[in-house]
Amino acid sequence: MSNTKPSIVFAHGLWADGSCFSRLISTLQAEGHEVVAAQNSLDTLKGDVAAVTRALGRVSSPAILVGHSYGGTVITAAGTDDRVAGLVYIAALAPDEDETSQSQQAKFPTTDVFAHIEVADGRVWLKPDGITCFAGDLSEQEQKLVWATQGVPDADLFNQRMDGTAWRSKPS
């Protein structure tokens, strides 16, 4: 589909999936943008970068990558792709080439949500009592849905290194 407006590819963070952008997607589509939300597995950073790169292949170029939370790390690496015109970070990590998500996050105060997690079976689970810290602006029904469908990251995900730092060469 040829388009005069840039395409938009979203990358979600922990305990979420691509549907977390559903309200934005509808609005952007109504404005004439091609929009895709990548579905990150949250197993490996390399795999999540590959998911965003695959999503880039489904839309016209140029594209804008939008990352939320850990999704910022993903777009920082995926954004080196020639089809990417720019990056948007929404309350997101944007590590430099010598950083990991964890080392960048360690520079800032810990958010309340991390008092409501449990590491089990090599995954980081959000406990039910943590949903208000994570999605407090949603209705109770929406919070329950987010908790029930949470994407559960690998416990080592934030320690994995990325290749490429797109914000050094692309508008951000």
PLM segments and residue spans:
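Conserved serine/cysteine hydrolase catalytic core
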Residues: D48-V49, E140-Q141, A148-S172
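Active-site catalytic motif of lipid deacylating hydrolases and related acyltransferases
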Residues: T4-S61, T111
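Flexible "cap/lid" loop of the alpha/beta hydrolase fold
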Residues: T80-I131, D154-D163
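Gly/Ala-rich beta-loop-alpha elbow adjacent to hydrolase catalytic centers
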Residues: V66-G71, I75
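Pocket-forming structural segment of enzyme catalytic cores
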Residues: A120-T149
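Short, conserved loop/helix-junction motifs that constitute active-site signature segments
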Residues: N3, A78-R83, G164-K170
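Active-site signature of alpha/beta-hydrolase-fold catalytic machinery across serine-
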Residues: R23, A77-A78
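Glycine-rich His-Gly loop
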Residues: A11-G13, S69, A92
